[in-house]
Amino acid sequence: MSSSSAASIGPPQPPPPPAPPEEEKKCLNSELWHACAGPLVCLPTVGTRVVYFPQGHSEQVAASTNKEVEGHIPNYPNLPAQLICQLHDVTMHADVETDEVYAQMTLQPLNPQEQNDAYLPAEMGIMSKQPTNYFCKTLTASDTSTHGGFSVPRRAAERVFPPLDFTQQPPAQELIARDIHDIEWKFRHIFRGQPKRHLLTTGWSVFVSAKRLVAGDSVLFIWNEKNQLLLGIRRASRPQTVMPSSVLSSDSMHIGLLAAAAHAAATNSRFTIFYNPRASPSEFVIPLSKYIKAVFHTRISVGMRFRMLFETEESSVRRYMGTITEVSDADPVRWPSSYWRSVKVGWDESTAGERPPRVSLWEIEPLTTFPMYPSLFPLRVKHPWYSGVASLHDDSNALMWLRGVAGEGGFQSLNFQSPGIGSWGQQRLHPSLLSSDHDQYQAVVAAAAASQSGGYLKQQFLHLQQPMQSPQEHCNLNPLLQQQILQQASQQQIINPDAQNIQTMLSPSAIQQQLQQLQQMQQVQNDQKQKIQPDQSYQVPTSAVLPSPTSLPSHLREKFGFSDPNANSSSFITSSSSDNMLDSSFLQGSSKAVDLSRFNQPVASEQQQQQAWKQKFMGSQSVSFGGSVLHNSPTSKDGSVENKIGRDVQNQSLFSPQVDSSSLLYNMVPNLTSNVSDGNLSTIPSGSTYLQNAMYGCLDDSSGLLQNTGENDPATRTFVKVYKSGSVGRSLDITRFSNYAELREELGQMFGIKGQLDDPDRSGWQLVFVDRENDVLLLGDDPWESFVNSVWYIKILSPEDVHKMGKQGNDPRYLS
C-alpha cells in the first residue's frame, strides 16, 4: 500500500494507523448510524480495555433467530463468564437490504500478566452521537399508503426542513436526503390541506416501496452541521411468521461464538464479533472502567430502589423505577459467578411486562448514588441541615429551629441562600419566638384545665388582640349573623377530655345571653381609641366555657396578663389587622393563644385549618383561629357586617383551642405571599428573591408577593420556575408541552444550551425537578402526566454543578 512506501522514505517514522476500508469511507455517516442505532447505544473506544460477556452474545443470537439456547449445546469449562480484552477495531455497518445497523469489533483477550499491568482507564465509551436537529416519527397506515404522503409534524418540519417560501401558493420545495448508504432520495415538501399541514408527496411512495416500510417502522430526518438532510429508518421489532433458514443453524451459531471465544481465551488471539444494537437485548461488550465502577464501587442490596434508562417511542429516553428483589446468578449451571444479569428486579409500573426481569449492575442507577443536594436549589428540604437543628417539618417541635439548640445560634446561625433573608427574618420575628417559653405555656394550659371558669383565658385573648381591634367593628352585629351563630351553636358540643369537664350542647337561651354580654362588651370597647384601619376584620366565635387557672403561679399570671380571677366566660371577639402580619404583637399573641391545643377538643380537620390560614395570607383574607375558619367580612360605612360568616364554621365548635403554635407558624411562614400592605414591604427591596432559601421554600420575587392565591395554588398553577447557575430564573408554562423531548428542547433554547439537554450522559448536563413534596428527582423518571401534576421547580445542572455536588456528598447539610 502507499502508506508502507511512504514510511520507507526519509528518517524513520512511526507507522501510521491502518486506513479504514474504502467502502466505509463512502457508505456510512457516523451521526446517522448512531441515530439509527438508538439513543442508548455506546460503542467502546478503540484501543481501550473492555469486558466481553459470551452469555450476552448468546442472547443476541437467540433474539435474532427467535430460538433460545438449548441444553444440548456443549459447555466450555475453560471459557470464563467474562473476558477482559483489548479492543483493536470497531467498524460500523448497515445491511444493504434492510438498512439495519450493526458494528464489527475485533477483540483480543489479555493474559493474567497484562491484566495486572498498570492501566489508565479511558473514557466510558463513545456515547451515541445523537444529532441535535432531527425528528423521528413512527409511521402510520396513511404514511405508508401508496396514494398518500408522509405527514410531518409542524414543529418538526419548521425545525429540520429548510424554510418554505410562503409567498408561493401553495408553498412547496424539493428536498434531497441521503440515507445510510449515501443514496439520494428526492421528495416534494408542500404545505397544504384543511387544516394545513406539512406533507412529503412526490417521491415518498417510491421510498416506502424501496425500503419495504410498514406501519410501525420509524423514519428519522436529520439536518446536520454541513446543512445536509440525512434520512434513516428503524425497523419495528415484530415476530417472524416464517422462520428463515438461519434458524436451522442457530445452534451452530451458538456453538461457533462460544468456540471462538474459548479458543481466543486459551491462545490470547484476536477474534471478531458482531453487535446489532437494535436486536441485542443488552450490550455485551462493556468498557472496563464502567464494569469496575459498577461491580466494585456500587453497593446494592435487596430492597434498594433504582432507575434504569429505556428507549421509548420516537427516539426519546425515559427512566423507569424499580426495586431490587434478588442478587444471584442468572444461569448458575452454565455461567456460575457471572455478573451478567445478576440482579433480579421488580418494576413499579403496569408496563413491567415489557421490562426485563433481570438486569446487570452497569445498566441500573441506584437511587443512593445520584447526588441530590438542595444547596444548589433555592428550595426547602425535608430533612435538617444540622444534626442539632430540627427540621421545619418536625411536628414534635417545629419551633426548634428558631430557638437554637446546644448553644448554636438557632435562627441567626442558619445559612440562608438568598441575600438579606436573615436580616428580614430577624426584623419581623418577635424575640419571644426565639425563647424557650414552651414549658411556661404548658403551665398556663394545665392551670386553666384544672379550673372551672374560662374568664382568665377570655381576658388573655382580649389582651393579646387589643392592638388589632377597631372600635368601628364592634358597633353593630348583623341580625342574620346572630341567627346563624345561634343555629351553629345549637349543633356544637365542646368536650374537654384532659380536664374531664364535659360541656353539653349550648342551648339557644345561653347563646342569647352571651350575645347580650357581647353587645355590652362592644360598648365598652368603643371607648378604646386606637388608630387602626378597619379594612381587615377577622371574627372569632369563642363561646367555649374554659376552666379558670386558679392554681396558676403569680409570676406566670402576671406574665400572661391574668389579672382578674373573677372574669366571666368568653364571648364573641372581633379584631382587625392593618399592621405587619409578622409584627411582634401578632406573633406573640398568636404563639401564646394558639398553644391551647393540649385541650384536644374536637375541631375541624387539619386540612381545613391549613387552608384557612393559607387563604388569610394569600389573598382571600380568612384565618383559622382556635380550630374555626374565620372569613374576612367587609364592613359597610355604618360598620355593619355585609357578608355571612364562612360555611366552614358550621361543623366546628364555636371556640376550639386545638391549634398548635408549631403548625400555625409552619402554615403561616411559607404562604406569606400576598395581602401585605405597601408599608409592610418597605424593608424588602424590589425585585429581590427574598424567600428563595432552603427553609421557606422558593417564592417568586417581590412581584409575586402581591399575587392572588389562585395564581399560587399548587392545584391550579401551570407556570413553573426554571433555574440555572449563572442565569436569571425564568417561568415556563408546563402545559405547552406534550412530552419530555419538547420540554428539553425549549429549555435548551431558553438558556442558550441547545442540544446539551437531549443526551445528559454524553453532555454531562442534568435536569432535575422538585415536586410538591419537596423531593428532588431526575427529570424523565415519571410518566409525563405525573410529572406535570407534581412539578414545582426545575433546575438545570451543568457538569460543574454535578461535579461540585459529588464532592459535597458526605456533608449531611446537603442530603435530601
Swiss-Prot record:
Residue ranges with Low complexity bias: 1-10
InterPro entries xref list: ARF_dom, ARF_plant, AUX/IAA_dom, B3_DNA-bd, DNA-bd_pseudobarrel_sf, PB1-like
Biased composition (Pro residues): 11-20
Main location: nucleus
Subcellular localization: Nucleus
Gene Ontology molecular function, alphabetical: DNA binding
GO biological process terms held by the UniProt record: auxin-activated signaling pathway; regulation of DNA-templated transcription
Sorted UniProt keywords: Auxin signaling pathway, DNA-binding, Nucleus, Transcription, Transcription regulation
Region Disordered, residue ranges: 1-24, 526-565
SMART domains, per the entry: B3
Domain of life: Eukaryota
CDD domains with a match to the protein in the record: B3_DNA (cd10017)
GO cellular component terms, semicolon-separated: nucleus
Domain PB1: 717-801
PROSITE patterns listed in its UniProt record: B3, PB1
DNA-binding region location: 135-237
Disulfide-bond pairs as recorded: none
Subunit structure: Homodimers and heterodimers.
Function noted in UniProt: Auxin response factors (ARFs) are transcriptional factors that bind specifically to the DNA sequence 5'-TGTCTC-3' found in the auxin-responsive promoter elements (AuxREs).
Entry domain remark: Interactions between auxin response factors (ARFs) and Aux/IAA proteins occur through their C-terminal dimerization domains III and IV.
Similarity comment: Belongs to the ARF family.
Protein name: Auxin response factor 12
Species in which this protein is naturally found: Oryza sativa subsp. indica
